[in-house]
Amino acid sequence: MFKTIATIFFMTLSLSALAYFHYPEDRNYTSNDRGYTQYGAPSLYKTGKYALTFDDGPHPIYTPKILDALKLANAKATFFILTSNVNEKTFPLVKRMLDEGHIVASHGYTHDNSNTVTREVWKARVKKSIIDVAALYKRAGHSFDKFYYRFPYAAYGQRSDYHHMNVLKEISQELMGDNCIHFAFWDFDSSDWVPGMTPEEVLSNFKASNEGGKYITYKTIKTKAGKTTQIKVRKDISSPNSGGVVLEHDIQHSSAEGITKILEYVASNNLEIVRLDEVEEFKITKNCRMKE
C-alpha cells in the first residue's frame, strides 16, 4: 500500500543515541508526539545487520515466493499482516510463517489511515486485529508472546481529539493487563510499492542503504483527471545507515522477485539478516500473554 505519509526514508539519528524499547511510554501523549523517524533502530546502524519486514499480506501468490526465498537463505522476517486478508486459502501461509520461524504481527484489520478515523473506530479495529493474530497463533499451534503493531502509512498522532499511543496502551491493558504492544516503524523504505518498481530497482535501493549511491523514492502528483498518483524520482544517498529495519510488502511483485536478489547480495557482502526481536529496540522485555 502507498506509504504516502512516510516521506523520510533514512533516519538521521546519531549512532551515539541511546537505544530504548518501543513500547508506548507511561505518560500522556499529546499532539506534539508524532513523527515516525524518531523510532528507528540505531543499534543496527553501521553493523551490516538488517531486519526484514513485510506488510499488507498474506498474498496467495507473492507471499509463498518470499517464504521460499527466506527458507533457502535461512533468513527470518516479520510479517505485519492485515487480518482481513486471512481466510481459509491464506491461513496456511500464516501457519507456514510461524512454522518456519518468522514473526507474525498486526498491521491492522484493514489498511486504514489512523489519522482519518475516530477513536472508537481505530481502537476497535486495532484491538480486533490483535485478537485475530492471537487466534491465528493458537490455531497454528504456536505461543503468542511477541506483540508488535505497525501503523499503516506510519500515520499516527495527528488527531486533536485523541492520541493513538494512549489508545494503544489501553488496548494492551485490556488484552494483556500490561503495556505490552511494541510499535514498529522502519529505517529504510524499499519503495517496492511505488508504481513501476522492478525487482532490480528494489535490489538497487537495498544496496544504496548499505553502500550509498542512487536511491529511488517517489513524489506524489495529480493526473489530468484530478487524481493523485506516485512517480519514481531518484536521489543520492551520501551517508547510508548500513543497517536497520527494512520495509517491504509481500503483496508486491517487485519484492516477491527481488527478495532473492537481496538475500544473495546480503550473503556475498557479509551482511546479516536478524529477526525483529533480536534488535535491541524491539527485544521482548516483558512476559506478556493474552488474558484468558
Q: Which residue stretches match the model-derived regions?
A:
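Low-complexity, Gly/Ser/Thr/Pro-rich intrinsically disordered linker/tail segments
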Residues: Q252-E292
